[in-house]
Amino acid sequence: MFMRNNNNILKTLMGGGGSFSSGGPGKGMHSRLYLRVLTKYHDVQSFSAFSNVYDSTGLFGIYLTTPPDFVAKAVDVAVQELIAIATPGQVTEVELTRAKNSTISSVLMNLESRVIVAEDIGRQLLTYGSRKPIDHFLQCMEELTLDDITAFAKMLLSSQPTMASYGDVDKVPPYEFVSKRFQRFR
């Protein structure tokens, strides 16, 4: 559950969104990617964190949409944001508390749906071999610290990154250049 909880909190902490967000105002407006990227770089059309967790491994990343002329800068900003979350002192207690509260709220609201509860039971049985009660999940979330999130982010960045691009990719920085930026974590 350690990886799952850290991954979920980290995804919420990073957050993101688009320059236009359907579903009403206020969604993700306090997340790091919204505050530090979308409000500052108007050429970025969307910039969001994503994650998937499996038994003993997982996937965490950032996807972005931007015009071709801004893609090199956008990739640089994405790298900077990933490095920032792995750097002690760059994430505040307020940001972590907000991410924890948002994640807990989202999980509790989702568990009001019987379909989602059934999917969650199946996912936990397949992934962990048993189902943990919601109180266990809530306690794990509450116990996460800034040190836990920083250590988890460092662990994520210590693996070889994967990079995918589509569209007009002529101005996308080469993989080797991007990968080298994370060298200090390996």
Regions found by a protein language model. Name each.
Residues 1-36, 75, 161-186:
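His/Glu-rich zincin catalytic helix
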Residues 4-9, 28, 32, 73, ...:
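Generic recognition of stable, solvent-exposed alpha-helical segments in well-folded globular domains
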Residues 8, 48, 137:
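A glycine- and charged-residue-rich anion-binding loop/surface
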Residues 10-14, 34, 38, 63, ...:
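Generic hydrophobic alpha-helical scaffold/packing signal
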Residues 16-28, 41-44, 48-115, 184-186:
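M16/insulysin-pitrilysin zinc metalloprotease superfamily fold
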Residues 33, 45-50, 148-150:
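Glycine-rich, charged/polar anion/phosphate-binding loops
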Residues 100-186:
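C-terminal regions of mature proteins
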